[in-house]
Amino acid sequence: EVENLDMVKEAVEAGADIIMLNIFDVDHPVINGLPEVAPEDTIHEVKRLTGRMVAIKLEPAAVRNDGEKSVWSLTEGRRATVENAKKAADMGVDMIVLTGNPGVGVDNKAITKALADLNEAVGDRVILTAGKMHASGILSEAGEKILTKEDAETFIEAGADVLLLPAPGTVPGFTMEHAAELIKTAHEKGVLAMTTIGTSQEGADEETIRQIALMCKMA
């Protein structure tokens, strides 16, 4: 996940095949450090500079006006709506990831609804990825309930091309065995699976990252 040009460069140098832009607002497309281009050309410029596919996150939740603001605070241009998905596709986005940032409050039912809507609208133009890296503020969907086999099957039926799930060892209660079951389900249904790190292990030491990578491989 990257938010500025330096992070884009680091991801490419580390071997990334896909650049995922977190908190990218389709109404206000900004990537700090990018050469000056028209807003609608922002994604195309990233692709030109890197030669990589570009993904963005869209979150199926409402914008809250409770006065609390943080880097994760949802904006209209980051919501998982058909209008925003069409804007993203027009900008050149290759993949839309339907998920939730920390504390936003995205549940799996909302992901399913948004996935079905976006699949109908732009499913033939972009890769649709669905799932969660963590509970996203939904306590009833923690541990193995972050993503169950039933959730996975529902996402796939709604049009997911890629199933997103936490990497084993990154969130409490999400084991290698559970990940393996979900990955098997995805592959049997003819879609891809993507294990992810969306928690504090992003800044962990090399040995920890190596262990997580091996668990993902075994799953």
Spell out what each predicted region is.
Residues K217-A219:
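C-terminal functional extensions of proteins
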Residues E1-H44, L49-M215:
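Conserved mixed alpha/beta catalytic, RNA-binding, or beta-rich assembly cores of soluble enzyme
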